[in-house]
């Protein structure tokens, strides 16, 4: 279970590693062979935060808490809960549904985040926790007890079998609905499977230490959080800007040039910050070839509608740039009018002084 936060403008990961001390466990990169198709400019920092006790369905589970810190200002908290051995598929589905619906409150995650930020605060530029978070659940299976060797794992887990786990639906879903809800299924070997949905994913991977699929899904969620956050901020910025401009026009009609100066400076800085951050987020992970992990990552971005969020941000940035040009033109016009008025006043004063000599 993942919960991702935006905690600041940037995080100096080397500095954060020093501040974490023994809790820090270095940078994280995909390990499998096809990971060569993915380039990560500044790999996230991993921190092991210890174990926590959770109560699920009347049973007590020990969960491992960890964090990934991304240089573009995101902190991802991960709560890893191990199911009991020997569960049947219906039992595992019930466990997964109970886990995803358990009462791990926002306040509990916030408490864990606050403790972490106390340690790494000096490494964060412009530290502030944004009100927006991103949640995602990954169901992981390392071993199938009664696997059918004559069929691939993908064949053993058709969509209708996965629906109760991934969507919580106990009634059979129509075949057309299943195709629409689960279009993203991937297998690299016969014994692995990754199925992605908007809120969660199933990963069947017999190599216990191979967490590469989870890594790229987490990375995609971190990027989604940043895009959603800046889209939200820009959406709030536009009406606030219009209200401020209207107020300045009403209160200072003769001094618009000076009144708009602060607005223009702030607007220019904000547009530059958003543009730089969005580009840094999108360039944090680059796909160089069409292989397994790259396809999983691309599917996650498509599923999370990354392009739609980016288009929304670009549209709002265009409006802000056009507003900047309009206000700048209006300020220049106001300055020119004031200059013309000053010239007229000087001419009138000169005429008055000249006439006064003959009176």
Segment roles from a protein language model:
Residues 1-192, 197:
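Short Lys/Arg-enriched alpha/beta "domain-start" segment
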Residues 15-18, 108, 112, 161, ...:
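Exposed alpha-helical structural elements
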Residues 50, 57, 203, 207, ...:
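N-proximal short alpha-helices
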Residues 58, 63-65, 184, 189-191, ...:
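Short, flexible coil/linker segments at or flanking structured domains
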Residues 98-102, 217, 224-227, 343:
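Short, surface-exposed linear patches
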Residues 104-108, 224, 230-233, 302-304:
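Short, surface-exposed, polar/charged, turn-prone segments marking secondary-structure boundaries
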Residues 163-259:
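Extended, charged amphipathic alpha-helical segments
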Residues 229-231, 237-351, 357:
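Membrane-associated alpha-helical segments
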């Amino acid at each position: 279970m993942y919960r991702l936060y935006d905690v600041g403008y940037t995080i100096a990961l080397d500095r954060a590693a020093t501040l974490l001390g023994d809790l820090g466990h270095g940078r994280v990169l995909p390990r499998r062979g096809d990971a060569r198709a993915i380039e990560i400019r500044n790999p996230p920092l991993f921190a092991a935060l210890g174990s926590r006790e959770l109560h699920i369905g009347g049973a007590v589970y020990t969960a491992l808490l960890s964090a990934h810190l991304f240089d573009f200002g995101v902190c991802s908290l991960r709560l890893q809960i191990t199911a009991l051995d020997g569960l049947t598929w219906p039992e595992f589905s019930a466990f997964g549904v109970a886990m995803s619906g358990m009462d791990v409150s926002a306040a509990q995650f916030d408490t864990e985040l606050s403790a972490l930020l106390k340690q790494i605060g000096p490494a964060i530029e412009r530290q502030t926790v944004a009100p927006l978070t991103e949640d995602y659940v990954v169901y992981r299976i390392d071993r199938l007890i009664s696997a059918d060797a004559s069929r691939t794992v993908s064949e053993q887990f058709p969509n209708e079998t996965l629906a109760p786990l991934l969507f919580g639906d106990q009634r059979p879903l129509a075949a057309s609905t299943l195709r629409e809800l689960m279009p993203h299924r991937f297998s690299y070997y016969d014994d692995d499977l990754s199925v992605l949905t908007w809120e969660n994913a199933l990963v069947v991977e017999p190599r216990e230490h191979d967490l590469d699929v989870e890594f790229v899904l987490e990375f995609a969620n971190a990027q989604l959080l940043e895009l959603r956050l800046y889209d939200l901020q820009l959406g709030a910025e536009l009406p606030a800007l219009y209200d401020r401009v209207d107020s300045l026009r009403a209160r200072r009609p003769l001094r618009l040039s000076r009144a708009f100066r602060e607005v223009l400076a702030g607007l220019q800085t904000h547009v530059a910050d958003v543009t730089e951050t969005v580009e840094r987020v999108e360039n944090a992970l680059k796909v160089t070839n069409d292989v397994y992990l790259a396809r999983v990552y691309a599917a996650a971005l498509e599923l999370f509608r990354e392009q739609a969020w980016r288009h929304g941000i670009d549209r709002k940035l265009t409006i802000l740039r056009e507003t900047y040009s309009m206000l700048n033109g209006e300020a220049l016009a106001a300055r020119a009018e004031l200059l013309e008025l000053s010239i007229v006043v000087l001419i009138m004063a000169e005429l008055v002084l000249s006439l006064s000599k003959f009176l």
